[in-house]
């Protein structure tokens, strides 16, 4: 399905979801090859034996004509998996190698994971280390901010990190977004933040 909501997490369910994504990717690639083969046939170009065998899978027995393959998707299928509020559940238990392994390999499945938690440390370190982005909403826990800055933003001092955080979250519902690939910090999605040198 193009979208699905599951109430409970299990490794088996995630495995099924990822397998379905893998099948969709393979179907897309095979259909792309079949379309090229069909077009080659329609131009009366010479076909290999393997191509002829594949072409006959497109033969419509009712019309005795070759049906042009049609893509199910308009482009290579990508997937977003949202893991919401799983802190304290078996999904995040220490040593859940399955979930960590899937997240590590997610790019091969053209999949992005969005992990939403009430507190960053509800998510195991192994998963946190895989994050390319982090969105932090308002908190008064200065110790947490200091730990997060040391763990994730080595290009900023803890003081700079906290200054940016205070600026980014000064309005209700605003958040600080850290892009670890670019070493970039934003207020919400569109305002890139910079540290200004203090004037003497």
Positions of predicted regions on the chain:
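Intrinsic disorder/low-complexity signal
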Residues: 15, 23, 33, 50, ...
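Conserved ASCE/P-loop NTPase catalytic core
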Residues: 27
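Conserved P-loop NTPase motor cores
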Residues: 1-13, 31-160
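P-loop NTPase motor core of the ASCE superfamily
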Residues: 77, 81, 95, 145-200
């Amino acid at each position: 399905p193009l979208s699905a909501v599951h109430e409970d997490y299990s490794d088996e369910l995630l495995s099924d979801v990822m397998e379905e994504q893998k099948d969709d990717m393979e179907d897309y690639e095979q259909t792309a090859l079949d379309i090229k083969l069909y077009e080659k046939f329609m131009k009366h170009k010479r076909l290999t034996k393997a191509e002829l065998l594949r072409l006959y899978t497109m033969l419509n027995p009712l019309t005795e004509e070759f049906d042009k393959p049609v893509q199910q998707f308009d482009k290579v299928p990508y997937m977003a998996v949202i893991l919401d509020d799983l802190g304290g559940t078996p999904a995040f238990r220490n040593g859940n190698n399955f979930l960590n392994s899937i997240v590590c390999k997610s790019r091969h499945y053209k999949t992005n994971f969005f992990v939403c938690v009430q507190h960053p440390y509800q998510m195991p370190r192994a998963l946190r280390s895989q994050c390319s982005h982090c969105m932090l909403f308002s908190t008064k826990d200065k110790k947490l901010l200091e730990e997060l800055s040391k763990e994730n933003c080595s290009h900023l001092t803890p003081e700079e990190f906290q200054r940016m955080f205070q600026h980014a979250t000064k309005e209700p519902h605003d958040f600080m977004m850290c892009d670890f690939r670019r070493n970039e910090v934003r207020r919400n999605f569109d305002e890139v933040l910079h540290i200004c040198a203090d004037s003497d």
